[in-house]
Regions:
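Conserved beta-strand/loop subsegment of P-loop NTPase cores
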Residues: 34-35, 88-91, 100-107, 111-131
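N-terminal phosphate/diphosphate-binding loop that engages ATP/GTP or pyrophosphate donors
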Residues: 20-72
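The conserved Walker
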Residues: 10
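Local cysteine-cluster metal-coordination motifs and their immediate loop/turn environment
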Residues: 156-172, 186
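Conserved lysine of the Walker
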Residues: 14
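Hydrophobic anchor at the beta1->P-loop junction of P-loop NTPases
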Residues: 6
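Immediate flanking context of iron-sulfur cluster ligation sites
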Residues: 145-158
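Glycine-rich phosphate-binding loop used to anchor ATP phosphates in small-molecule kinases
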Residues: 67-110
């Protein structure tokens, strides 16, 4: 799954940009999911949410007291991935998320500074403004191609097995071009688990327990031989 977040101050055009991106990807025959963060409680009549729902295959909303797709309480975005099966995930808001890259929307009020935008995670900006060396995309086509080329999603486990203190550190290096998503050992190890097409990360300790248990059970089966095994399970 390719993923990108749209981050900027209020009235900076995040929703409008998200809608245009979704339309662009749909025209390419891709499935698209959208996740919208909100500082207030959610309801299906929310204008932005319904706009996304008219275009996207799946929509999630994450508010302070509830999570859209009617789960009570706040949930961690990676927990929703099995329900957001798509080729591309568009996240609006979530400025503190460090496990995916972002596009900066800078047309709004920046009087509070730029540190909260975490430009170190930015693949680019959209519009007429940018920050420092961050490339600016002036068309939806240019922006969409950038997302398809460089978008990614880490598990957000902060397990440190990649040699960095958290997923944000790896995400920064991926954005810089000095690492790739394959450096995430929680997602790329000897066992791969996905639910409804969405990969599930696991710490090495958990991976060792699961893989060792499965190997021992498979060895007892008639017809077993060493090699690469494929196991499909309804959960």
């Amino acid at each position: 799954m390719k993923a990108i977040s749209l981050v900027g101050p209020k009235k900076s055009g995040k929703t409008t940009l998200g809608i245009k991106l979704a339309q662009y990807f749909k025209k390419q025959g891709l499935t698209v999911s959208a996740a919208k963060f909100s500082h207030h409680d959610l309801n299906w009549q929310d204008t932005d949410t319904t706009r996304y729902a008219e275009i996207c295959d799946t929509v999630a909303g994450l508010g302070p007291n509830e999570t859209f797709i009617h789960w009570d309480g706040h949930r961690f975005l990676p927990d929703l991935l099995p329900l957001l099966t798509a080729d591309v995930l568009i996240v609006e808001g979530g400025k503190e998320l460090g496990f995916l890259p972002r596009i900066l929307c800078l047309s709004g009020d920046l009087s509070d500074g730029i540190e909260w935008l975490h430009p170190e995670l930015a693949l680019g900006s959209y519009g007429e403004r940018t920050l420092g060396p961050i490339p600016v995309c002036k068309t939806i086509e240019e922006l969409g191609d950038l997302v398809l080329e460089k978008g990614f999603f880490l598990p957000g486990m902060d397990c440190e097995t990649c040699g960095r203190p958290d997923c944000k550190g790896l995400a920064e290096d991926i954005v810089k071009g000095v690492a790739t998503p394959e450096a995430c050992l929680a997602m790329h190890n000897s066992i791969t688990v996905d639910i409804n097409g969405a990969p599930v990360g696991m710490k090495p300790f958990v991976e060792e327990i699961i893989s060792a248990s499965i190997r021992e059970m498979l060895r007892t089966l008639k017809g077993y031989s060493p090699g690469k095994a494929t196991l499909t399970l309804d959960v």
